[in-house]
């Protein structure tokens, strides 16, 4: 239920009440012009009605009848009305509706106008609005890396996919990517890696590079910095990602960051490392090391597996104050030049659990061991002992290091949390292909995983997994009785609500890995001028998985496979390293590569012998998964109701036997006995009731029941000057016990007399003549049912 103040609670409990509402369109209060309003919410699913609380999506609808103010409403608000008045109800306009009693209201609806209809000659305009689902009408697309197949380990979960689809629609559950869009200006900020860690290592931008074993970690919600966090089960959990842009090290400001909860730990250290690909197969790095026990923060610049220089700071608060910290570091390499060794100034960035930003003086690396030769970002490594959420790396994050503000670090005013998730369930090795809108994809996931998706009255998206309805609550959110609250009540029980044999299909990915697809070799040597960017689109097949940017080859250590070489001349020249940023992204059937030259001279995509050097090597899976099924059943229920089967539709979202078992058992637990549905429950209007609430229904007049039920549908209507009417659809939290049939002897399904009638040939064999039959004195009924065998 929604929270409310004592005054509203008292108003709703009083014998008499005065209805109240407030309605804003486009931020303008129009409640006084509302002739009537109606709000409807219900779970939508393809399951039997009595089971519909267990999966599907809920999209709320608001209908308003709007009158004019001094002039007819159509003149003000029709599609052809002047923009000065008509825009307040145009399609896409914001709508906020509140309802209550005695002047106190709570949120009832938040969404956008979908349509307006003006009846000419009347004083009424009908406005229909939908909730936040309208914000998710953009095309759905999920990143599909090959690494889950490569390691045979889950790369994401259904929860992660929902969170990613929400993010695409601008609905966030944690700080968003700082600069997700590809800008024409190569000097603009750009997010090269963003991993929410909301139930998966898959990343919105970039790709996983290595995956830990599932036994080494868990996904937690309690104590997560924002929503869901990666929690190691032992110290030193390692995971790494590939950026979507291999940016050059010199001449810019870039940063890496994450959020942690130091109160949830299995050790006291964390390392976040940016690895850069140098020439001749060597690698350099900038690494942030945090020691929570001592409050020491170190930043290292050096060579992977070799020497380097370490800068150190001490923050006593880091050791003394446990909780959610925002940690990271900024690297300023503007003093370096493309093609030369690069010095850097580094800045640790910390925000404490109390919201205080901890400033620190920069440290400048000038020692020879700390200078970075020409190179490009290759990999991002994380090693952690604490709970981690929302990791991202931003190229060109700020013009300089010194003017960077605490508000910019915290992205203040740039995002609002608009989603609440559930436990990360339904692991995925290979992300299914999605189609349609983001809302369509979320609905598909909800139905496939017995989850629910909805926007509440405040416009917050809520995702609840299959465990939501499996435990009966101890006490209700509200009690309604026929003595005071209930005006009408219909209780129904149907055999269609009984499902005592539940079967779930799943995909078996055992033995399936990834392999190279058909190599695509460029046909043109491309010139990239200084300061310019060149984009090239290469066709990829629908069944091919996502790949990262090509690796950058140099002449000292030639490579094969997915790569590109930049030459100093169109005929080949010498290889150029650390001068060109290479990024990639997938857009439907196209794999788009972007080259940006940061040097002072043109370079060409050319091999040493003068041929085009861009070589794209797509990835695909080695085969298709096998379809298998898992079923749970209940023989006691089958004895009373017969076998009632539910076969879940085959879906790509169930990829483990255990998940299939969990889902089929959840459905069996919900439907092994038909649970009563309380339909058309007309109650006194209570604006606090929400979908999923538990209501205690006490009927002392008709059905004589006292039971708990979940709210799975709400319809509220109100006309000006009248009391609101609220109708609930409820699903019982449990069934009314196992049938006992006391004192009953149920008739068998087949008439016992069928097949017992004697045939003519049998009667003829027992009576030689008609006279013998007549003399026997047997009646006709006795003749047909007598002993001597059954009918043929």
Positions of the model-derived regions?
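Assembly/oligomerization scaffold segments
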Residues: 1-401, 425, 429-435, 439-450, ...
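Acidic, low-complexity/disordered segments
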Residues: 1-9, 20-22, 120-151, 283, ...
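Surface-exposed fibrous attachment elements
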Residues: 3-17, 175-218, 223, 247, ...
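Short, charged, amphipathic alpha-helices and their helix-cap/turn boundaries
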Residues: 161-165, 402-416
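Short, conserved helix/loop micro-motifs enriched in His/Cys and acidic residues
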Residues: 413-431
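Extended amphipathic alpha-helical segments with heptad-repeat/coiled-coil character used for oligomerization
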Residues: 446-447, 451-479
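Stable alpha-helical structural segments in soluble proteins, enriched in small hydrophobic residues
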Residues: 658-672
